Amino acid sequence: MNILYIEPYYSGSHKYWINSYKEFSKHNIHILGLPGRKWKWRMHGGAVTLANEFNKLDKKFDLIICSDMLNLPVFKSLCNNIDDTKCVMYFHENQFSYPWSPNDPDIKLNRDLNYGYINYTSSLISDYNFFNSNYHKESYLNELKKYLNKMPDFQNKDSVDVIKNKSSVLHIGCSLTKSNSIQNQFVEPVILWNHRWEYDKNPDLLFQTLFDLDEMGIDYNLIVLGEQHQDYPKIFDEAKNKLEHKILHFGYCHSRDDYVNLLNQANIIPVTSNQDFFGISIIEAVSSFCFPILPYRLSYPELFDYNNNKINFYKTDIEFKNKLIDVINNIGSYKKTSNTISSNIINQYDWSTMAKKYDSTFLKII
């Protein structure tokens, strides 16, 4: 089967996802993308540019998969010879549920809902919609209902059910390599941060807790990874100074091999995020035997099977602190649990498994 993937924001996790699927898939996948910058302009203008590029292609596709950053109605209206080709949306994020920076001028000017509307019309016109977690799917549908309820008339509320009836969950596949160093990993506690340096990841809770633990004389080491932009939370600078004596690495890692090696040095990943539709960075860390400490919210109870792994979850900030202290002080006793969780995660989300699921799912669409 020949698949075309349309990506206005071909960068970061979006690029990682489709490139990995292309590598493991039995289908032929062609990628049509634009550089990942100026996301608002990509959601508005990307469809026009990509439609022009599509019309230059001398190839017939069986299926078109579109990123949530694409304005699908505009794209389809400008494309030649596309009417009989099925188009599906894959939602990494959506602009109804995704938290905006309070400093964004579009919020003050009441322009922020325009991007959610693009998601709405795209999911309405698509032949099918996939979401990277059930939490994401339900969050999107609930926020869409709220959005339509705010409209003055002709709210088209029945369109929510139309979208719901052609939507399902297709978890993200990950390139997971099982560490061979578990015996050494659980000698000394090494805490890992490998998420984006963004406010929605709630770094303040983690680092303020680590400051407290340092003052209490609790011994641990720290590895801080993750992509950062110019306007990152300043708690990272404070952490770099206050915890300098505990830091093994601090900053973005450009090499994939170096990144994996650093994951393999860590054994605890405390998660404090207020927003996460999936959690690739956490899946990667857990596959390297890091013991996850997870909030009981977002996609985590779904991905990490809360009913069978309650030991990994917390519900309050105090519970988070106490659980982190316990894991640090008793790191050796958590080795067996981490091994079990890691094996389950690899078996479930590695591309060797997920690519087969993707391939069969997309075949059923056409």
Predicted regions and their residues:
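Short alpha-helical donor nucleotide-sugar binding micro-motif in glycosyltransferases
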Residues: V260-A266
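Nucleotide-activated donor-binding/catalytic signature segment of Leloir-type glycosyltransferases, i.e.
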Residues: D161, G226, K234-H254
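Conserved donor-binding/catalytic core segment of Leloir-type glycosyltransferases
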Residues: F130, H171-S175, I182-K201, L206-D212, ...
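Short hydrophobic beta-strand element within catalytic cores of glycosyltransferases
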Residues: F291-L294
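A charged, aromatic-enriched C-terminal amphipathic alpha-helix characteristic of glycosyltransferases
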Residues: W41-G45, K315, E319, G332-I365
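Donor nucleotide-sugar binding/catalytic pocket of nucleotide-sugar-dependent glycosyltransferases
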Residues: L124-N180
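Aromatic "clamp/platform" in nucleotide-sugar-dependent glycosyltransferases that forms part
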Residues: N274
